[in-house]
From Swiss-Prot:
Residues 1-23 form the signal peptide. Keywords: Cell wall, Cell wall biogenesis/degradation, Repeat, Secreted, Signal. GO terms for biological process: cell wall organization. It comes from Arabidopsis thaliana (Mouse-ear cress). This is Glycine-rich cell wall structural protein.
Amino acid sequence: MGKVSFGFLGLMLVVVVIGVVECRRFEKETLGGGGGGGLGGGFGGGKGFGGGIGAGGGFGGGAGGGAGGGLGGGAGGGGGIGGGAGGGAGGGLGGGAGGGLGGGHGGGIGGGAGGGAGGGLGGGHGGGIGGGAGGGSGGGLGGGIGGGAGGGAGGGGGLGGGHGGGIGGGAGGGAGGGLGGGHGGGIGGGAGGGSGGGLGGGIGGGAGGGAGGGGGAGGGGGLGGGHGGGFGGGAGGGLGGGAGGGTGGGFGGGAGGGAGGGAGGGFGGGAGGGAGGGFGGGAGGGAGGGAGGGFGGGAGGGHGGGVGGGFGGGSGGGFGGGAGGGAGGGAGGGFGGGGGAGGGFGGGF
């Protein structure tokens, strides 16, 4: 009586230690913050809710948690600092799958609903700083409003890349790269744009653009490439070009040119441009337009147009072109030459 063996005391100590460990484990599984608490826990705590470093919330994580949490969490995952509802695992600022600052679905600083997968600063579908709902794949600073149904897989890259990307890119955007590149991209690119975009993009551009098309390196024109692109081009424009434009555009591009329009346009080209355009392109061209256009070509340009070519021009026009040419115009045209098959220096009509 009254005697307690050291063996019994040791056994009791082991039981107490095991009990404490099991209680703490049970507490974590049922009440804790997923992976270790964190500042502010989560909304409702528990497995998968809010939580700390590891799975779930983080600093004030929301209901639903998710792996990677951060400041604000969000329902259904959405780690990262300030992750919104629906975020994913590994988020940065804005949460979402994909990591990086603002990466992942809806990521980016304040990324919109829907977002997408991606990384970098605001990358991923819809990402970017303040990316819009739905966004395109690759987003950039400003993202896009929706980028069309399904967005574009693997697009993006560069500042503002991806559908609608670019710094403040318009709706529709595209899948290019560079500074505002991609469909419609560019700094402030328009809605729809062409598939090569540059600074300024286009309002509608044409299908195809990008590699191979018209002037500049890599098709579609230099700054503002893509079909009709150019420096700040509108739909097909060049520097202030008109609607429709050509494929390569110079400064000014062409405005449309009947069914098919011209392919080149020049400096201030008219409606229909030619296909290779010089400075000015052609103004009409009919169905398909002409192939050359010269400096300030006329309204119908031929295959070569000259400086100021007239209506209907010939196919090789010289300096000044002619005014008539008949159905098909002439083949040569000289300095101010008109229609006819050979036209000389100042030839007739």
